[in-house]
Amino acid sequence: MFSYILFDLDGTLSDPKQGICGSVQYALKSFGIDEPDLDRLEPFIGPPLRDSFMRYYDFTPEQAEAAVAKYRERFSVTGKYENTLYPGITVLLHDLEQAGAKLAVASSKPTVYVEDILVHFGIRQYFDIVVGSELDGTRDRKEEVVLEALRQLAQRYGAKPWEVVMVGDRSFDIEGAKAAGTHNIAVAYGYAQPGELEQAGAEIIVRDVQGLRQVLLGGAGHFARQGAGQNGRQDGWQTAGQNVWQNAGQNERQNGWQNARQPGRGAGQEPPVGSSRRYRSSTWQSTGQGSAAGTWQNAGQGS
């Protein structure tokens, strides 16, 4: 078991869609933009808000700053509480603490909001360290957040980067962990787009909280790489349990999903397209060896 575990917040510990997307919707209205479909705003969950306003709505830096200010008008009052913990998270945190792990939160969300949310859900006591961004926009890159969390863990406990694992749901979490020299685990129940976590080079991908529990309490042995191509597979991913997929050495492959339960079910069906919400809530998995989309099949739990 890893002694030091960093958790992302949004899309990893909790589902913040209503609060974040509702607050983005509120900010856009101040610019005369009406976006009634919250699903279309899901890409705002995870990365820095300024970047997202510029990327998805072509805002100038000045407009993006103003949009963030409007966003916070709503989020700071009601939005941060329009949020739910994923089932099983509280028990997982309790059991990790009882097992002796040191836990931290490493989020791109401002620290003041992270603290409020953790207290609101009654889970603040499980975390030794909480690191987020600053309200002035500094330290909002995931690498910076992870490095600050590592600095505090090293100062307090003497932790080394290779003794730490970062758990998150977006490519930013995986890339930040890799840049900081830590291990990483990606959760597929969050807000990643199809193929995003594989492309980012996640060491392990878990489908649900039970899979995350299996890896975190099961030991660091899940990170021992297996030889690609076992059992005739041409991709770089190997099944490490019913809810866990492990990178066996070919991070660049986008089609490396295998069904650990019912390999033949629903073969040839097309996956939901362009919706991270559907990707999150269902168990559509790629088993193909062609394009990034591959051949998709339903493992038994529809959206």
Features from the language model and the residues they span:
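Metal-dependent phosphoesterase signature
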Residues: 54-94, 99
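A short, structured active-site edge motif that brings together acidic residues
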Residues: 124-139, 163
